[in-house]
Amino acid sequence: MRILRFASLLAAALLFTSSSLLAQDTRKVTEPVIPSSCVTLNANIAAPRGVIALADEQKLDTERIQHALDTCAAGQAVILRSQGQKYVFLTGPLTLRPGVTLVVDAHTVLAASRDPRLYDLTPGSCGIVGERGRGCKPLIFGDGVQNGGIMGEGSIDARGGAKLLGQEVTWWDLAHQAKVLDKSQSVPSMISLRHADGFTMYKITLRNSPGFHVSVNLTDGFTAWGVKIMTPKTASNTDGIDPGSSRNITIAYSSINTGDDDVCLKPNRAAGVSNMSVLHNHFYAGHGMSIGSGTDGGVDHLLVEDLSIDGADNGLRIKSDPSRGGLVHDVTYRNVCIRNVRNPLVFTPHYTVFKGDRLPIYRDITLENVHVLSPGAFTFLGLDADHKLGIKLDNVFADDQQHSLFYNQDAEITIGPSRGNLAPAGDNVSITQAPGSAEGKPLECDARFVPFPSLATAPELAGKVPPEDNNLYIAADGTGDFYSVQRALDVAKEGQVLMVSPGVYREVLTVDKKNITIRSNNPDASKTVIVNDRSAGANGGTLHSATVNVTADNFFAENITIENDFNATHPQLPAGSQALALMITGDRAVFHNVRFLGNQDTLYAGSRNCSPDGKNCIPTRQYFSDSYIAGNVDFIFGDSKAYFDRCEIHSTAHAGGFITAQSRHNPDQDSGYVFNHCKLLVDPGVTSPVYLGRPWRPYATVIFMNTEMGSHIDPAGWREWHPGETHSIDTVYYAEFNSTGPGAQPDKRDPHTHFLTPEQVKQYEPSVFLRGSDNWDPTQLPKQ
């Protein structure tokens, strides 16, 4: 086999005399050499245009490859070699042996079988989507394989984009289904190593893993040199190289394009990751250079030098949370160029919403000669005021900051000795100039961004590239694209769909972009909760207290809970404190199977642009279907044109209450609330009367049709805003049709109540009432 020497790369490395290949790895790492062979196996399968004939899919080479590995002497190699048009070795799971190197020769591919049964840990456990759990063997496994290796200029293709035998889905289809459904996919990883001291990967090309490409655990001494990983960016959970609980790791001269972390350090409670060098590499699509999300074993003495990241979702990232955190320190990123990256720099101990006592602490983090050439989101977060992020920015430049987002809090940032233009400010962020600081100069990056290297000697078999999924996925456990809904909204484009996994998201949302959808695939809306505890008193008034504020048009929400729990978190304050769950002033908004929880002033549905005297109001329309709204005083209020279809309206404990406080200002305003086929329920044991509404403005308009009313509804139904002081009830339009239940007492209703005829009811059907000049009919909207 011809052995190339990477002469040009080594010459380039001389430019970086500050980092020999000792670096943080305590070993002296030199370019590997392929061992002599104990046996050479020849391929028996052809694959014209990358397609293996169905008959050949049964002709596995697993047994002969495994026999060769089992019988090869330590220090030697099993070589897989093509012969003529036959260049494919087809295999199920393989087990490496100590001291033995598997070599895939140039123009040869070691291909994974598409039969999921070969990878079962238990019968039927692999190739499925289900609850959390792992059900697959890796394609290549090594435990106790000291001084072994995987080398060669050929490729290992795990065929993540090929349909499974007997099925119509690919491995990657399963991964996408799991992401959408917030489930776990059981798919095989490509290479899994444990206790693999002195293991080396050299020149090999890895393609299309269904799961992680390389994971290394409990190992002292691992080298990946000249490795190429090429997997589509749309293939979920396909990490490149993941060192976990290991030390003395070098990843050098490698090129990685994948659908998840390009390189990710993953310590766990067993041990940390230390003494690692990532040198002279190029990352393309993926999630960048990451540490975490578990850091409870600790990370120290990491050097990342001469790295380009082009087109990834993330750049340099440390991520963890208090449920699995630990100390990350003595980490240096030097001579790094980043462009076309959504999140160029991310340092967060709040990667998920999980709580715990394993605190993620980041200190002695150094960025030296780092240049970010395009806008993105920058995150510099400490855990809290007592556990700040400690980071030094030495000659760090970020272009186009005016179009970037910054999330900075609880950080101690040192600038220099070379001053760049990045100095993140924020709440409880201190910035200190290093002694002797001088103006810096941006790192020159043009020559550092290079095309992905040629894969001419590394064949690829046919498969389907997963389509681009433009949805944004939010998961409280960190398995999505974001752990925060608002962070997703910050980067969302008009028309995007935000898929929120079950969990509790304690935050405040502002939706100011058109055509946004927020939904969960779990039909139990109580499982996906967006909650906060803002109040009118603490936030400048009722209309500034909302957990969710929607000002943009064409908003859609489904299968979620929107809650303001101010009274629960402040039990010492009066129960009547005004605290909104939702404020909606956007037009053509739809809420389906959404729970709105609060007490006083739960849901504000209003028009916009009104002057103080109620003039110039721009009407807005909202449609609420199959939803649940809880509160006690004026908990559905405002002056929009809103329709509540098949909703449950729940009155919570309070000394009296009012469901609506509609606020139509004048007879000409296009405004009113309609409730149709709803149920009016109440907390058990509540005896105080509840009214259907009172008029916040003189021309309040509310209609209840076909509604089942509990006994808590006062027989009068409606009441003046302040009896004896205000006189709006004389000009309101309060109406009912076909009310049922013990609360429906037409003969005792306030005399201002109108009782509709069947003919009059027609004008209050949603397709008529909400039509507007654009003929909007929310009941005919396509299923989201």
Regions from the language model: what does each represent?
Residues 81-83, 97, 103-105, 111-113, ...:
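Feature marks extracellular polysaccharide-active and adherence modules
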Residues 57-64, 103-186, 203-206, 253, ...:
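Right-handed parallel beta-helix/beta-spiral solenoid domain characteristic of secreted/periplasmic
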Residues 65-71, 88-98, 102, 203, ...:
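Short, T/G/N/S-enriched strand-turn elements that build extracellular solenoid repeat scaffolds
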Residues 76, 91, 112-115, 159-163, ...:
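Short glycine/acidic-rich loop motifs that flank beta-strands on beta-rich extracellular proteins
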Residues 76, 86, 92, 98-100, ...:
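The right-handed parallel beta-helix/beta-solenoid scaffold, focusing on the short coil/turn
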Residues 54, 66-91, 96, 100-113, ...:
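Glycine-rich repeat segments that build the extracellular carbohydrate-interaction surface of secreted
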Residues 42, 49-50, 146-147, 257, ...:
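Sequence-level preference for short, compositionally simple segments enriched
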Residues 93, 147-282, 506, 554-650:
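Right-handed parallel beta-helix
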